[in-house]
Amino acid sequence: MIRTTRTKGGLLILAIIIGLIIGILVPVQTSVNTRLRGIVGSPFLASLLSFSIGTVFLIVLTLFVERNFSLNPGVWSEPGWIWIGGVLGVIFLTGNILLFPRIGGVQTVIMPIFGQGLMGLLIDNF
């Protein structure tokens, strides 16, 4: 029992550290993508480039970790809303690129976090 508790505690600390690192990277990503917008002249082109590079990275990562691209055939019979995650990612990324120069870095990071907290409460309660 003690050994399991230590392992779970160690994993919890690791998860917290990873969460903090991800939190640190969100404003960095927004800042980098806003700079990219200035270079290419369009928030949508900046988002497209960012997602394209991310897609290439995910392909390499998937091949390295999973060793293949096979999907469970049952995935195609799932409801259509299951595929909306990518669209929501584009809205989030492009929205941040549009907001950053208008409201600044702090509010561009804080408002989505506040929204996530509100939505998390709704999801947990309904």
Residue ranges and their predicted role:
Residues 24-32, 72, 76-103:
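Hydrophobic alpha-helical transmembrane segments of multi-pass membrane transport proteins
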Residues 54-58, 92, 119-120:
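Alpha-helical transmembrane segments of multipass membrane proteins
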Residues 39-42, 95-111:
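Structural motif at transmembrane-helix junctions in multi-pass transporters
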Residues 26, 42-47:
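Membrane topogenic helices and adjacent juxtamembrane segments
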Residues 116-126:
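C-terminal transmembrane-helix exit sites in multi-pass transporters
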Residues 49, 111-112:
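Hydrophobic core positions of alpha-helical segments in small-molecule transporters
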Residues 2-21, 35-38, 44, 53-81, ...:
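Membrane-interface interhelical linkers
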